[in-house]
Regions:
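Alpha-helical scaffold segments in soluble metabolic enzymes
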Residues: 32, 80, 111, 150, ...
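Short acidic/polar active-site loop segments enriched in Thr and Asp
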Residues: 39-40, 45, 95, 122-125, ...
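C-terminal helical cap(s) of enzyme catalytic domains, especially alpha/beta-barrels
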Residues: 55-64, 200-214, 256, 268-293
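Alpha/beta enzyme core
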Residues: 91, 104-241, 247-265
Length: 305
């Protein structure tokens, strides 16, 4: 019997498979298809202080080996998430959930994290620092080590639950950002967020997305995710959550060998709503194929091979 359970920031997971924020709604939508308690946990839709309608349409475009999106953090706002979404989730999901938080200022990050930290259902806070800083000229918090550290420190001072900082790959040095977050008190790092891209409409001779650019996800970015997880694992001492183009149980094993303690699955859910269940069910077979008895034994295993 293989062991799939791992521990993420002191909280146990039955397995390391975590649907990524923005691809799994608030969970209950998928609970109509299968028992989502088979998952390790999931990261729910990115939450901001105020409701957001998101970017204008079209905001999703297909591409070779992936998806381009510029949804724009559409969400009902933290008040509605706490009052409406989490109670609905509680009826179908009986494990701690990961709360993904976005903000456009330090104050917004702190307020939203503090509110969600007080919710018994929330086990982890995943802080997305890819948002533009409205008080910093629009530059993303996640592209500057000092700004990344400032968000991390401010949130950590305001909450009790583990804080996992989600990093953007659109940076010069991912390890500098990761170390800055660790030094500021982060309990974990998740990466990679989407890669900036663009597609053009040949007939209209303009971008396919109304926003112009969008975040690229799907199997095309998987090798980039493996490389960056590898680098960050070597740079920090806190747990790493790997994501970016994960489509199979083999991909989960590969990211864990690169250094991930747990693995998020994003775009695969948009292609196949049963993707995460399939990966969870297939994990024991793949473990046996590669002579893995306990997933904990392979975290970062390729660094020692």
């Amino acid at each position: 019997m293989v062991k799939t359970n791992v521990t993420l920031c002191s909280l146990p997971l039955d397995n390391p498979v975590i649907p990524a924020s923005g691809t799994f709604g608030y969970g209950y939508e998928f609970a109509e298809l299968y028992d989502i308690n088979c998952l390790g946990t999931f990261s729910f839709k990115g939450t901001t202080r105020e409701p957001r309608l998101g970017n204008p349409q079209p905001r999703i475009a297909e591409m070779q080996s992936g998806v381009l999106n510029a949804v724009g953090l559409q969400n009902p706002g933290v008040d509605a998430v706490i009052a409406e979404e989490l109670p609905r989730l509680a009826r179908v999901f009986h494990k701690p959930v990961m709360a993904n938080v976005s903000g456009f200022s330090l104050d917004e990050y702190v307020e939203v994290c503090r509110r969600l930290d007080a919710c018994p259902q929330v086990g982890w806070l995943e802080v997305n620092i890819s948002c533009p800083n409205v008080h910093g000229g629009g530059m993303s918090f996640g592209t500057d080590p000092k700004a990344a550290a400032a968000v991390t420190r401010a949130v950590k001072d305001a909450v009790k639950k583990p804080v996992i900082v989600k990093l953007s790959p659109n940076v010069t040095s991912i390890t500098d950002i990761a170390r800055a977050c660790e030094d500021a008190g982060a309990d974990g790092i998740s990466l990679i967020n989407t890669v900036m891209g663009m597609r053009l409409d040949l007939k209209a001779r303009k971008p396919l997305l109304a926003n112009g650019t969008g975040g690229m996800s799907g199997p095309a970015i998987f090798p980039l995710a493996v490389r960056m997880v590898w680098q960050v694992y070597e740079a920090v001492r806190i747990p790493v959550v790997g994501l970016g183009g994960v489509m199979s149980a083999e991909d989960v094993i590969e990211l864990m060998l690169a250094g991930a303690t747990a693995v998020e699955v994003g775009a695969a859910n948009l292609v196949d709503p049963f993707a995460c269940r399939r990966i969870v069910e297939d994990l024991p077979r793949v473990m046996q194929k590669y002579n893995i008895n306990d997933l904990n034994d392979i975290i970062g295993g390729a660094h020692h091979g």
